[in-house]
UniProtKB/Swiss-Prot annotation:
Belongs to the TRAFAC class myosin-kinesin ATPase superfamily. Kinesin family. One of its GO terms (biological process) is aorta development. Essential for hedgehog signaling regulation: acts both as a negative and a positive regulator of sonic hedgehog (Shh) and Indian hedgehog (Ihh) pathways, acting downstream of SMO, through both SUFU-dependent and -independent mechanisms. Involved in the regulation of microtubular dynamics. Required for proper organization of the ciliary tip and control of ciliary localization of SUFU-GLI2 complexes. Required for localization of GLI3 to cilia in response to Shh. InterPro entries: Kinesin-like_fam, Kinesin_motor_CS, Kinesin_motor_dom, Kinesin_motor_dom_sf, P-loop_NTPase. It is found in: Cell projection, Cilium; Cytoplasm, Cytoskeleton, Cilium basal body. The lineage of its organism: Eukaryota, Metazoa, Chordata, Craniata, Vertebrata. Residues 358-1211 are annotated as: Interaction with SMO. Disruption phenotype: Mutations appear to be the cause of the matariki (maki) phenotype, characterized by expanded motor neuron domain in the 10.5 dpc neural tube. Motor neurons are increased in number and expand dorsally. Mutants die at the end of gestation, when other phenotypes characteristic of elevated Shh signaling are apparent, including preaxial polydactyly. Knockout mice have defects in developmental patterning and die at birth with severe malformations, including exencephaly and polydactyly. This is Kinesin-like protein KIF7. Residues 480-542, 698-1057, 1109-1211 form a coiled coil. It comes from Mus musculus (Mouse). The modification Phosphoserine is found at residue 903. Expressed in heart, lung, liver, kidney, testis, spleen and cerebellum. SMART domains: KISc. Gene3D superfamilies: Kinesin motor domain.
């Protein structure tokens, strides 16, 4: 049931449309057994709260309604009205945790599946699709994101903006305007989603009992659309120069809160109070507007800032849809009732919507500058193609032909200028092929060369980007100058021919480029369709099961950061997926075979999941290797085109192409009110009813889906950054070219400055020499002193000029180094772009891997689905058996209570049953003690094994050290033997040498004594060495101190472990004796137990079974409560994981945003550098020549004007002296003579060029000031009655001459600025005329006074 938007010409009455959306019960609510208190009837547009509270709305959306259906029903008509020029607003209202942010689509856009995207992404995708489909529509889209936190504004797109800088004002039409909010121009869906994520990361959120990430502020996401070039259907066509401006507000209100329920304290309490006060003000406005009895009374818009923002949306100039979000839980009955009451009142509000036409002149200068920089690319292409018609060149021969030729030249220049700007943008575009890029680059180089040639050849008005009006004025002036005009016409004709040739080349290059764009767009569209088809196939083949442990495989990205406000897929089976199979009521008294089968299913599922993970990882590695090899063979990955930039990677266009009446592709989670009871039955209902086997997505499939979404988001973000980097590279290339051109000019300028500096230095040296000569002589008179003073002034001026030239040279050298800096930055940016492209390629490979893994998962899930069906049949059979057993037990209980056998159980029998129950409990305790003793014995044995293993390790280490000590001892013994043998040998040698000393000659004795000393020294060293070795052997220090200490510690540790092992052995021996004794006793007790049980009657046996059945039920209930607490803890863990993931994503997005802001600043810097380089180039080279010619022409015109005014002054003086007796004939003669003299004066001016003479300047300054005062007084004096305008005899004859004079000369009474007069004084005196001035007629004076 959609909202029908009325579209009538002019203003129309548009009631506020109200849609009601009911979210499903949350897992936590299901866990605690909350019931639904709402009954929805979407076909009738009715909803019932409780039993008898009925409400009707335009649209009612149930729990199973998906996001696509919400968009089609609520926002699609508003988007159509938005494009027709109406303002539109959609705002979500409701309590906290009711799904407002999820419905609006502001929460975690990147981590949500495509079918779960909210209103804002879908509306923006549809808007850009409509813009792209209409080529003739010239649109400009701005977005802003504002937050209202504690009644203070905060710009989420420019967080640094102070709150006081954002003001709420009203324009002259009464519309509410926000001043100081940053508006960002966007060209595609990716940019909008990126800005939305950036603002969402900066938004105020906090944790309450209802929501871990609850919105603590109101947000307003505004989209402004400016349209030109067409008129909406059924609306009057506007006048020329108007544009269509419409705004779309997406308002996400913070939820109303009950402080006792949310548990807010401290800062959260203050936020809750502020939120409730603003919502109360909004409720008062809705009540005042919706109450028919209060029509015309005061509306309290100014009670809150949010009501002032929504002033146009509620009762003003807008079409508004209110989406009321409610919770079906019975615990939120009062909040749901309040929301329904407010929504019901809002249906009575009537708005007056009008089409917003605005004159172009009212646009702000910033928008004009943005439009001048260039419209979106596809619209520029359309305009250039439509203007590319060939217009025949007119022939030369008359003024009309000259004017037509000038107009044609202006059009060609405009065309070429547009082509130049378009090709510059096209060159910066990443998807341009190599051949087309070379053609575009050659064409741009040729245009820049022609521009410089024309600038140097024909003055400042010959550039390609000159204004058409200036060209026409220059052409019109040149057409009136005879031979010079003919030459100008020939030049313009050649320029027109050349420009047309360039235009044809440009159109050919443009067609090639557009063809390449079309081919690339088709290929990418096919890839997107394949991705969508695979995704749909995956969604259709995604079964699940109710096995335990599924939460452990869920990735953090599979949850949104706002867990309690979104209708999660499978939310009602969340608790069943988390609970173990033992918690299900159907298994409480099931047979042992059923438990075994459940374990088998779990083991089989886990084994298949492990097998699938290993297979997918192996296949992914193989595919990654193959794709890397293929990537090396490729030259360059395909670049993104304009279509992708505007429509994003995700398949928004296919989804947005659904008609409003078509059913949505995907429904939300189907939940019936009876499902909570089936999911978590009460203890009283145990054993009754049927437990449905719910389905969930497999962990591997959800992980794959999450990775796929993350890869797509990463690709989109990287694509935006790559495009911005490429644009910056283009700016750097243009800056480099401009810097090179400026370098050439500066090199020439440096040479000229050096020559001028040399000349100035020579003059300075000469002046200093003359100054020294004059100072060396004694001044004789005043002339020499004045000459000396003049020389000093000239020397000071020359020195200052030399200093200025040095500074100019330094500045020029700094500019020369700008090119090298640009080259370095360009190389760095190219490396960054290559790195981003590699990352993009890796993400694309991951996309293909995930797609392949999805295909394999489909096959696996089909097998699992078949297995689940088999288990369902088996489960149903077991449930039937269980139901029969339960009915038998219930019948027995009834029979026992009612005494159907005719006899009442006596007190003695009851006591006997109690005794038997106690006896059984004692026997059970004995068995449990035996089992605990066995477990303790096993634990002791395990501990002993650990101690033994530790002792073994220590013993091995000790053995190693002892072996090392043994080896050291053996080495020392060997050293002692070797030293002893050497000492014996030395003793023998000493004795021999002593004998030779006694028997030898005197010469040999000296040599022998030296040898004896050497042998004694060696003997002493060996003795010392033997003493050291003996001391080591006696002390036993065969190891290092660290090793000795380690050996000592090992001995102590081994001794402690031996003691521990001895203690454990004793304890184990004792426990074994006790267990053997208790085992024999237990076997005897079991025999006694069986014997006693065999003696029990059937009634006693059933009574015992009932007692123990009640005990089992009690234990099961306790286990159920523990499981609920455990599930709540698991939910909290999941929420914390989501929060961590969301913060990580926000951090990564902030990094990307910082990189984008840096790129934008660098781009702006490069544009400013280009502007400075252009200005510098204009002031050098051709710019100086052009300026010199302009100044010379201006000086010449001023000299002529000054001469005319001086002649008029003399004439008026003679007229005053003669009086008013002159006749008409004398007036005619004087007038003709005046015209002749003026022509002679012009010729005289041409013969005598201006030359600066210092002696003329002072006299001319006084004369001109006096002439101006006298002529101004005389010209503005009243005329006599006899001087009539009709008395002019030559009025008709001189009309043509007057027109010529008016077009070429300023009026007589015009007072020149002082700068212009100063120019004429500096360039020389007025030539004296060679004729005597004569009187002029009164008619001539009248014409001079009133030239028009």
């Amino acid at each position: 049931m959609g909202l029908e938007a009325q579209r009538l010409p002019g203003a129309e009455e548009a009631p506020v449309r109200v849609a009601l959306r009911v979210r499903p019960l949350l897992p936590k609510e299901l866990l605690h057994g909350h019931q639904s208190c709402l009954r929805v009837e979407p076909e009738r547009g009715r909803i019932t709260l409780g039993r008898d509270r009925h409400f009707g709305f335009h649209v009612v959306l149930g729990e199973d309604t998906g996001q696509e259906a919400v968009y089609q029903a609520c926002v699609q008509p508003l988007l159509e009205a938005f494009f027709e020029g109406f303002n539109a607003t959609v705002f979500a209202y409701g309590q906290t945790g009711s799904g407002k942010t999820y419905t609006m689509g502001e929460a975690s856009v990147a981590s949500l599946h495509e079918d779960e995207q909210g209103i804002i992404p879908r509306a923006m995708a549809e808007a850009f699709k409509l813009i792209d489909e209409n080529d003739l529509l010239d649109c400009l889209v701005h977005v802003s994101y504002l937050e209202l936190y504690k009644e203070e504004f905060r710009d989420l797109l420019e967080v640094g903006t102070a709150s006081r800088d954002i003001q709420l004002r009203e324009d002259d039409r009464g519309n509410v305007v926000l001043c100081g909010v940053k508006e960002v121009d966007v060209e595609g869906l990716d940019e909008v989603l990126s800005l939305l994520e950036m603002g969402n990361a900066a938004r105020h959120t906090g944790a309450t009992h209802f929501n871990r990430l609850s919105s603590r502020s109101h947000t307003v996401f505004t989209v402004t659309l400016e349209q030109r070039g067409r008129t909406p259907s059924r609306l009057p066509r506007p006048a020329a120069g108007h544009l269509l401006v419409s705004k779309f507000h997406f308002v996400d209100l913070a939820g109303s809160e009950r402080v006792l329920k949310t548990g807010s304290t401290g800062e959260r309490l203050k936020e809750s109070i502020q939120i409730n006060s603003t919502l109360l003000a909004l409720g008062n406005v809705i009540s005042a507007l919706g109450d028919p009895q209060r029509r015309g009374s005061h509306i309290p818009y100014r009670d809150s800032k949010i009501t002032r923002i929504l002033k146009d949306s509620l009762g003003g100039n807008a079409k508004t849809v209110m989406i009321a979000c409610v919770s079906p839980s019975s615990s939120d009955f009062d909040e749901t009732l309040n929301t329904l009451n407010y929504a019901s009142r809002a249906q009575n509000i009537r708005n007056r919507a009008t089409v917003n036409w605005h004159p172009e002149a009212e646009r702000v200068p910033e928008e004009q500058a943005a439009g001048a920089r260039g419209p979106p690319r596809h619209r520029s292409e359309t305009r250039i193609i439509h203007r590319g018609r060939r217009v025949p060149c007119p022939a030369v021969g008359s003024a009309a032909v000259a004017a037509g030729l000038g107009a044609e030249c202006a059009r060609c220049r405009a065309r070429t200028s547009a082509a130049y700007s378009l090709l510059r943008e096209l060159q910066a575009e990443p998807g341009l092929p190599g051949a087309a890029a070379r053609k575009v680059r050659d064409w741009l180089c040729a245009v820049e060369g022609e521009r410089s040639t024309l600038s140097s050849a024909s003055g400042p008005d010959s550039g390609i980007e000159s204004a058409p009006a200036e060209d026409q004025a220059a052409q019109g002036t040149s057409g009136r100058k005879g031979d010079e005009g003919t030459q100008q016409l020939l030049t313009l004709q050649s320029q027109v021919a050349r420009l047309e040739e360039e235009n044809r080349d440009f159109l050919a290059a443009l067609e090639d480029a557009m063809e390449q764009y079309k081919l690339q767009s088709d290929r990418l569209r096919e890839q997107q369709e394949e991705m969508v088809e695979l995704r749909l196939r995956l969604e259709l083949a995604q079964p699940g099961w109710g096995a335990p442990g599924l939460l452990q495989g869920l990735p953090p990205g599979s949850f949104v950061p706002r867990p309690h406000t979104a209708p999660l897929g499978g939310a009602h089976t969340h608790m069943l997926g988390m609970m173990p199979s033992t918690c299900l009521p159907g298994e409480e008294v099931s047979s042992e075979q059923q438990v075994v089968s459940g374990k088998e299913v779990k083991a089989e599922v886990l084994a298949q999941a492990d097998k699938l993970r290993s297979a997918s990882s192996t296949t992914s590695e193989e595919e990654g290797e193959e794709e890397e090899e293929e990537e090396e063979e490729e030259e360059e990955p395909p670049r993104r085109t304009l279509y992708l930039r505007r429509n994003g990677i995700s398949n928004w266009s296919q989804r947005a192409g659904l008609s409003p009446g078509s059913p949505p592709d995907r429904k939300g989670p189907e939940v019936c009110p009876e499902e909570p009871a089936a999911a978590i039955p009460a203890p009283q209902a145990v054993g009754s009813g049927k437990v449905p086997v719910q389905t969930r997505q497999a962990p591997a499939a959800m992980a794959s889906e999450w990775r796929l979404a993350q890869a797509q988001q990463k690709i989109r973000e990287l694509a935006i950054n790559i495009r911005m980097k490429e644009e910056l590279i283009g700016e750097l290339v243009r800056t480099g070219k401009a810097a090179q051109a400026l370098n050439r000019q500066h090199s020439q300028r440096i040479r000229e400055l050096e020559q001028e500096a040399e000349r100035v230095r020579a003059e300075l040296c000469e002046g200093q020499r003359q100054l020294r000569e004059l100072e060396g002589r004694e001044p004789q008179d005043a002339s020499e002193r004045s000459r000396l003073q003049e020389f000093r002034k000239r020397v000071a001026a020359a020195q200052s000029q030399v200093q200025v030239l040095k500074e100019k040279k330094q500045a020029t050298e700094r500019l020369v180094s700008l090119s090298a800096q640009s080259e370095t930055r360009l190389q760095e940016l190219e490396r960054n772009v290559q790195l981003m492209r590699r990352q993009q390629g890796q993400l694309q490979r991951r996309l293909r891997e995930e797609t392949e893994q999805k295909r394999r998962l489909e096959t696996e899930m089909n097998k699992r689905q078949h297995r689940v069906k088999e288990l369902e049949l088996k489960h149903e059979q077991q449930q039937k058996i269980l139901k029969i057993k339960t009915e038998e037990i219930a019948a027995f209980q009834r029979k026992r209570r009612s005494g159907s056998n005719g006899s009442v159980v006596s007190l003695e029998q009851q006591q006997k049953i109690e005794e038997q129950k106690k006896w059984l409990d004692q026997e059970m305790e004995k068995v449990l003690q035996q089992r605990r003793a066995l477990e303790e014995l096993g634990e002791e044995l395990r501990k002993r094994e650990v101690i033994l293993a530790k002792k073994e390790a220590l013993m091995q280490e000790k053995t190693g050290l002892e072996s090392k000590r043994l080896r050291s001892s053996q080495a020392l013994n060997e050293d002692i033997v070797r030293v002893s043998s050497r000492l014996e040998h030395l003793e023998k040698e000493l004795s021999e040498k002593s004998g030779q000393l006694r028997q030898g000659s005197a010469q040999n004795q000296q040599q022998i004594r030296g040898e004896i000393d050497t042998l004694r020294q060696e003997k002493d060293s060996l003795l010392k060495q033997r003493l050291e070795i003996d001391s080591k052997l006696r002390q036993g220090s065969l190891l290092s101190p660290e090793e000795e200490r380690t050996l000592f510690q090992l001995d102590e540790a081994i001794e402690a472990l031996d003691a521990a092992i001895e203690y454990k052995n004793e304890a184990i021996t004792c426990r074994q004796r006790v267990l053997r004794a208790s085992a024999s006793l237990l076997s005897q007790c079991e025999m006694n137990l069986m014997a006693k049980l065999s003696y029990l009657s059937s009634s006693e046996t059933r009574a015992l079974l009932c007692k123990y059945f009640d005990k089992v039920v009690t234990l099961r209930e306790e286990q159920h409560q523990q499981q609920i607490a455990f599930s709540e803890l698991e939910m909290q863990l999941e929420e914390q994981q989501r929060l961590v993931y969301w913060l990580e994503v926000a951090l990564e997005r902030q990094r990307l945003e910082m990189d984008r802001q840096l790129t934008l600043q660098q781009k702006e810097h490069e544009q400013n550098v280009q502007l400075l380089l252009q200005q510098g180039r204009d002031h050098l080279g051709e710019g100086l020549a052009d300026s010199k010619r302009q100044y010379e022409a201006r000086i010449h015109a001023l000299e002529k004007e000054l001469g005319r005014h001086m002649w008029i002054n003399q004439e008026l003086k003679q007229k005053l002296s003669a009086g008013s007796t002159a006749g008409q004939s004398q007036g005619c003669e004087r007038r003709s003579l005046c015209l002749e003299n003026r022509q002679c004066l012009g010729n005289e001016d041409g013969l005598h060029p201006a030359a600066p003479e210092p002696l003329w300047q002072s006299s001319l300054l006084e004369g001109v000031s006096r002439v101006w005062d006298e002529s101004r007084d005389l010209v503005h004096a009243p005329l006599p009655l006899t001087w009539k305008r009709s008395s002019l005899c030559s009025e008709q004859g001189s009309s043509e001459e007057s027109r010529v004079r008016e077009t070429t000369e300023p009026p007589v009474g015009r007072v020149l600025p002082m700068g212009e007069v100063g120019l004429s004084w500096n360039f020389g005196p007025l030539p004296k005329p060679r004729w005597e001035p004569r009187r002029t007629s009164p008619g001539m004076i009248d014409v001079r006074k009133n030239p028009l």
